Swiss-Prot record:
Localisation: Cell membrane
Species for this entry: Cereibacter sphaeroides (strain ATCC 17029 / ATH 2.4.9)
Keywords, sorted A to Z: Cell membrane, Flavoprotein, FMN, Membrane, Oxidoreductase, Pyrimidine biosynthesis
Gene expressing this chain: pyrD
GO molecular function: dihydroorotate dehydrogenase (quinone) activity
The protein's name in its UniProt record: Dihydroorotate dehydrogenase (quinone)
Length: 354
């Protein structure tokens, strides 16, 4: 991390977390933030569910919810970006305060509740984005007051799919009441059928991923793996934030909402490894949760991930983190004799299944 990045983070950490979040996006939009540019190599370039990535380090949904800083983020060293979640209609989300830094734990708790500008506005921004080598996907959400949340996911995909490189069905946010109920076999099967019917009507392929919670039993994971394999989706994103609060030290540890960051790493990686085992490598997995270094990204890949995503770690390490992780990952692959990311996927899975 350079001196300028460190100074900017220090200033942002003196502010309310949500205001700091908004200011960071405004700074990116201004064009004044120094950015590392693209990071790739023959080892890092990879294919995940039909997405061709310059490197496997992605930005998780939730940072640029409304797709307002895409031009800058595409130059920040990420191999792919995910914006949203977008819902059919704009909604304000939950009352503030709803974002909390847990500095001692290198973590955050949020209870945003899918606050966003709505699908129409976000779709228009996706359509106007610069085209380049960095795929941009959309996290699909449902309105809080919707009488048919499954239909909401399909509606957002229908509206925005032509302008997105991929889409993620988010049934795992803990901040919309009863949303996680859609992870059950019957509900999930019906939901994915509706989404995949929409996808089938597109003129070009738009891979669809499913994002799951880390707070699932082994039986739940087995059901999800079975449904996912049968549905025709491109892969699974594992995982979203957790409701667990084990071992936290920060003053905000008991705030309600989803916990992200360092404390999620082990839990999410164990879920990832179990999914890799259940799907027998037939379904690409994207590992999310606590990735803050090249070593942690590499651990996710060796546990079964074909790519990784991060967000909370940027709160503590800055916008240049993705590029640093990608370069470090390249060195780790070279050190261990892997010619590609794909060669390393799942090679350490057994370590996470004990």
């Amino acid at each position: 991390m350079n001196i300028l990045e460190r100074a900017a983070l220090t200033a942002l950490h003196r502010m309310d977390p949500e205001k700091a979040h908004s200011l960071s996006l405004s700074a990116l939009r201004s064009g004044l933030v120094p950015l590392p540019g693209p990071v790739t190599s023959p080892r890092l370039a990879t294919d995940v569910g039909g997405l061709v990535l310059p490197n496997p380090v992605g930005l998780a949904a939730g940072y640029d919810k409304n797709a307002v800083a895409l031009a800058a983020l595409m130059r920040a060293g990420f191999g792919f970006l995910e914006v949203g979640a977008a819902t059919p209609r704009p909604q304000p989300g939950n009352p503030q305060p709803r974002l909390f830094r847990l500095t001692e734990d290198r973590a955050a708790i949020n209870r945003f509740g899918f606050n966003n500008d709505g699908a129409a506005t976000i779709c228009a921004r996706l359509a106007m984005r610069p085209r380049g080598a960095v795929p941009v996907g959309l996290n699909l959400g449902a309105n809080k007051d919707s009488p048919d949340r499954a239909a909401d996911f399909a509606a957002v995909l229908a509206a925005c799919g032509p302008h997105a490189d991929f889409a993620t069905v988010n049934v795992s946010s803990p901040n919309t009441e009863r949303l996680r109920d859609l992870q059950g076999r019957q509900a999930l099967t019906a939901l994915l059928e509706g989404v995949m019917q929409v996808q089938a009507g597109f003129a070009r392929p738009v891979p669809v991923f499913l994002k799951i919670a880390p707070d699932l039993s082994d039986a739940d994971l087995a059901e999800i793996a079975e449904v996912a394999l049968a549905s025709g989706i491109a892969g699974i994103v594992a995982t979203n934030t957790t409701l667990a609060r084990d071992g936290l030290r920060s003053a905000h540890a008991r705030e309600t909402g989803g916990l992200s960051g360092a404390p999620l790493f082990e839990r999410s990686t164990r879920v990832l490894a179990r999914l890799s085992e259940l799907t027998e490598g037939r379904l690409p997995l994207i590992g999310v949760g606590g990735v803050a270094s090249a070593e942690e990204a590499y651990a996710k890949i060796r546990a079964g991930a074909s790519a990784v995503q991060l967000y909370t770690a940027m709160v503590y390490q800055g916008i240049g983190l993705a590029a640093r992780i990608a370069r470090g990952l390249d060195a780790l692959l070279l050190r261990d004799g892997f010619g590609s990311v794909a060669e390393a996927v799942g090679t350490g899975r057994a370590d996470w299944l004990t």
